[in-house]
């Protein structure tokens, strides 16, 4: 999934904050997509998981984490991400082999008052294609998962350096994933999870700028009620680890919030709703993330 929201927010601020022209996050992956038990992949089967990702922001921060212009900033992004997931019965190194992929649809709108005048605009498009292979283990009170995936630059992308409102990023990204869920009690009513992702970026095809690598941590603590409902807290931390080839400043963000999920066994259907408040952001937008996830097993 794309971190489109931040790029659009910064685009709205260009006239007021020229020093942040190249401060957009370098991650393809948008934090907050996963939450409680995010490191646990399902048992063998074919699934369609529909992510509905909302991001709002009304401020832009400098590298010190302090709020800067523009005035009356209002930015909104909605991403619909239908993910196809197949966990096979085949095992490798004791883990179930799986494959998944998605192609996101992205809508963005933003408005702001800048020294150059009032800015307002919106855009809609298809983002970059992602495909991944996974391994997953379910051992007593632990779930483990690893994955290796690639983002292909199939969507419309920027043609010049700096922020852009296009749904694609214009470069290949190779993402490595590893995570674990620990069920604290034998009944598995308490769970603690951590999901780590690292993205290696390549040169942007038009700007010839190579974005820095990015690290993302998504975590969750949850309690199961009546066997079919989970409630808990979830959060994320994302940081640009290495600098862009154009020497622009690094960025990072952290968030926390509540989550509730419910399972409908007879219908083989699962739904989760999560909110994350970004309490810290450096060299990027600071806002709110909402995620509604619908999962159906076939």
Question: What label would you give each PLM region?
Answer:
Residues 28, 67, 204-298:
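Outer membrane beta-barrel transmembrane domains
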Residues 44, 74-82, 120-129, 170-174, ...:
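Residues that define the transmembrane beta-barrel architecture of outer-membrane proteins
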Residues 50, 82-88, 131-137, 148-150, ...:
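Residues on the lipid-exposed face of transmembrane beta-strands in outer-membrane beta-barrel proteins
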Residues 145-152, 158-243:
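Detector for outer-membrane/organellar transmembrane beta-barrel domains
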Residues 25-26, 55-79, 112-123:
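Surface-exposed strand-loop-strand hairpins of Gram-negative outer-membrane beta-barrel proteins
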Residues 35, 66-72, 114-121, 159-167, ...:
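Extracellular loop and loop/strand-boundary signature of outer-membrane beta-barrel proteins
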Residues 24-25, 38-45, 89-98, 138-144, ...:
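Short loop/turn motifs that connect adjacent beta-strands in outer-membrane beta-barrel proteins
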Residues 31, 48-54, 99-107, 146-152, ...:
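Transmembrane beta-barrel strands of outer-membrane/channel proteins
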């Amino acid at each position: 999934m794309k971190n489109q929201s931040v790029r659009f927010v910064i685009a709205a601020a260009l006239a007021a904050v020229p020093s942040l022209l190249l401060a957009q996050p370098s991650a393809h992956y948008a934090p907050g997509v996963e939450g409680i038990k995010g490191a646990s992949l399902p048992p063998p089967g074919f699934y369609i998981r529909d992510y509905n990702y909302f991001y709002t922001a009304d401020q832009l921060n400098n590298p010190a984490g302090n709020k800067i212009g523009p005035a009356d900033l209002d930015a909104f992004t909605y991403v619909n991400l239908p993910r196809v997931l197949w966990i096979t019965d085949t095992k490798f190194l004791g883990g179930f082999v799986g494959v998944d992929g998605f192609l996101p649809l992205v809508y963005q709108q933003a408005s702001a008052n800048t020294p150059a005048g009032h800015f307002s605009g919106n855009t809609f498009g298809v983002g970059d294609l992602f495909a991944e292979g996974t391994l997953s283990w379910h051992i007593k009170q632990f779930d483990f998962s690893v994955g290796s995936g690639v983002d292909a630059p199939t969507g419309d992308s920027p043609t010049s350096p700096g922020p852009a409102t296009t749904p694609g990023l214009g470069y290949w990204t190779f993402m490595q994933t590893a995570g674990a869920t620990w069920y604290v009690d034998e009944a598995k009513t308490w769970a603690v999870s951590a999901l780590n992702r690292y993205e290696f970026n390549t040169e942007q095809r038009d700007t010839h700028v190579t974005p820095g690598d990015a690290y993302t941590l998504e975590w969750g603590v949850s309690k199961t009620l009546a066997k079919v409902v989970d409630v808990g807290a979830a959060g994320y931390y994302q940081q640009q680890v290495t600098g862009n080839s154009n020497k622009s400043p690094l960025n990072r963000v952290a968030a926390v919030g509540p989550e509730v999920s419910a399972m409908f066994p007879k219908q083989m259907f699962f739904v989760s709703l999560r909110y994350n408040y970004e309490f810290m952001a450096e060299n990027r937008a600071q806002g709110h993330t909402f995620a509604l996830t619908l999962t159906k097993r076939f």
